[in-house]
């Protein structure tokens, strides 16, 4: 006898023998745990930033360079085994700082094509002026009331140093003064009267004579010093009169 229709197909049960149905709840949990583990591995705590001298107004750190969790329960694991400080005092590095730095770094500028410009023309350099090439100062001419030709005397006058002479080794330039024959005669006569010397008591008389002749006091003093040995010795030094008599003679000459 054959019995048909009593065999049940295996596929109708919905589950095949020897196969394990996939678990929908296990994969998200595994992926979440894997994600948390990867995130925890990226976070690192570096040197300790705790200020141990904050109460005194200073700044002192303990020198701990990296956080090491203390063995024990969860509360002890938040303390550093090296310095004993809480993990919050250590600098946290979650790996995002380097990524932010990469974003903040500007991109290198694009090179620009230089414009084809003509080469600049060389400019002529000014020739440096030598201090000795400056023209000398003109001769000092003294005014003369009677006129006549001027003769060069042996007296020398020290003029004010120019800027170029001061820059060139600080040398002073000496200038010769020219006198007329009338000026020389008057200076010779006055020098014989005062004895070829200038004394303090004759300063007013000397100033008056220099203003009358048109010669500066320093110039007359140098001239008298240069000609004292030659002219003064030949004339015997002259006879020196009193200042009152000299003033009276000068007043008479002016009248």
Swiss-Prot record:
DNA-binding region: 172-235
GO molecular function terms noted in the UniProt entry: DNA-binding transcription factor activity; transcription cis-regulatory region binding; zinc ion binding
Keyword Zinc-finger listed: yes
GO cellular component: nucleus
Alphabetic keyword roster: DNA-binding, Homeobox, Metal-binding, Nucleus, Transcription, Transcription regulation, Zinc, Zinc-finger
PROSITE patterns in alphabetical order: ZF_HD_DIMER
Disordered: annotated segments: 1-35, 106-181, 226-255
Coiled coil regions in record: none
SUPFAM superfamilies associated with the record: Homeodomain-like (SSF46689)
Chief location bin: nucleus
Ranges annotated as ZF-HD dimerization-type zinc finger: 45-93
Keyword Nuclease part of the UniProt annotation: no
InterPro entries: Homeodomain-like_sf, Homeodomain_ZF_HD, ZF_HD_homeobox_Cys/His_dimer
Compartments reported by the entry: Nucleus
Compositional bias segments (type: Pro residues): 106-126
Compositional bias ranges of the Low complexity kind: 21-35, 139-153, 240-255
Residues annotated as site: Required for DNA-binding: 224
GO biological process terms, semicolon-separated: regulation of DNA-templated transcription
Comment block on domains: The homeodomain differs form the typical one by having namely 4 instead of 3 extra amino acids inserted in the loop between helix 1 and helix 2.
Summary of the function given for this chain in its UniProt record: Putative transcription factor.
Subunit structure: Homo- and heterodimer with other ZFHD proteins.
NCBIfam families in UniProt: homeo_ZF_HD (TIGR01565), ZF_HD_prot_N (TIGR01566)
Protein name: Zinc-finger homeodomain protein 6
